């Protein structure tokens, strides 16, 4: 079983939901990414999503776009992201790390070369934003051959037939995007999310994580009542962007600890029913 699978199995045994936290590698500085990864874990993160900087992050809103721009200005590329993961693994061998990015950097390195290097570095899964499931079979096979879980996005507009396609090739967990549009959007409709998550579960045994629009403990709790995992990105990246110099780690830890409390409150409600 993969590290991602082990994490979800252990949490399920404790009647808890996963908190998945996203940061962009190299933002705000090249030397701050690994300390931030440890800060995320210390504050209660179960799985880290590490964004691979890219010059045209079309699925991302302005907050994460700016993070990518800062990381690229810091000259952080895919090889650096893998090196950061390897550095993190010297201390932490249990928290799964998922690389989230666009196909171009992976293609440029070559999928086979990338998958081998990612496995060696200690990466557990890869979410390629712009590869649709019908085009992903060969890539997914390469990832799986190197024990990397291929993770896919589903959205409110994804038809049921496509959900079945994704279920056939996905690993790790399904990432359901709870809002139309780009990352960082607001106005979370939990009833609609609940309907969609139920539909996804009809086709797939993998855990379902829900992201986009989660801002605080209350929205994290609402989503944790529905999904197996709560995914938070823009809110954390915004905290990194606005933190005074030297306070980034402390601010992120404070925010993530609050999100963790929200996620765990949903589990406590379930226990008390």
UniProtKB/Swiss-Prot annotation:
Entry keyword Lyase: yes
Enzyme nomenclature, EC number: 4.2.1.20
Keyword Amino-acid biosynthesis recorded: yes
An annotated GO cellular component: cytosol
Keywords: Amino-acid biosynthesis, Aromatic amino acid biosynthesis, Lyase, Tryptophan biosynthesis
Superkingdom of origin organism: Bacteria
Active-site positions on this chain: 49, 60
Task of the protein: The alpha subunit is responsible for the aldol cleavage of indoleglycerol phosphate to indole and glyceraldehyde 3-phosphate.
HAMAP family according to UniProt: Trp_synth_alpha
Name the UniProt record assigns to this protein: Tryptophan synthase alpha chain
Native organism: Thiobacillus denitrificans (strain ATCC 25259 / T1)
Underlying gene: trpA
